[in-house]
Curated annotation (Swiss-Prot):
It is a lipid-anchor. Keywords: Autophagy, Cytoplasmic vesicle, Lipoprotein, Membrane, Protein transport, Transport, Ubl conjugation pathway, Vacuole. Its main location: membrane. This is Autophagy-related protein 8. Signal peptide: none annotated. Residues 116 form a propeptide. One of its GO terms (biological process) is protein transport. Belongs to the ATG8 family. The keyword Lipoprotein applies. It comes from the Eukaryota. It is found in: Cytoplasmic vesicle, Autophagosome membrane; Vacuole membrane.
Length: 116
């Protein structure tokens, strides 16, 4: 279970997601957290309002910048333990994979693909 889910009760999360969706219908409420046991840096904020027309690849770029990941390091994002297609629109992923509370939960992990 994500730490966001542990820290915030279901009713509160659901109410917040509904408020966000009604106030910003063209945005997707996303919770992005680092995978357990990953050696990649922690992200400075977990909650994102992502434009619906953003691709998964563009969102990965946003994450890379936020955690200041060097170019030789790889980053992988998972939604419900599945690697989403890079070209997929966040709006499509949201409709298919959103949690019952209304948020889309994304986990990121990394490994150095070029070795050291």
């Amino acid at each position: 279970m994500s730490s966001f889910k542990k820290e915030h009760p279901f009713e509160k999360r659901q109410a917040e997601a509904q408020r966000i969706r009604s106030k910003y219908p063209d945005r997707i409420p996303v919770i992005c957290e680092k995978a357990d046991r990953s050696d990649i840096p922690d992200i400075d904020k977990k909650k994102y309002l992502v434009p619906a027309d953003l691709t998964v690849g563009q969102f990965v770029y946003v994450i890379r910048k936020r955690i200041k990941l060097s170019p030789e390091k790889a980053i992988f994002i998972f939604i419900n333990n599945v690697l989403p297609p890079t070209a997929a629109l966040m709006s499509n992923i949201y409709e298919e994979q959103k949690d019952v509370d209304g948020f889309l939960y994304i986990t990121y992990s990394g490994e150095n693909t070029f070795g050291q």
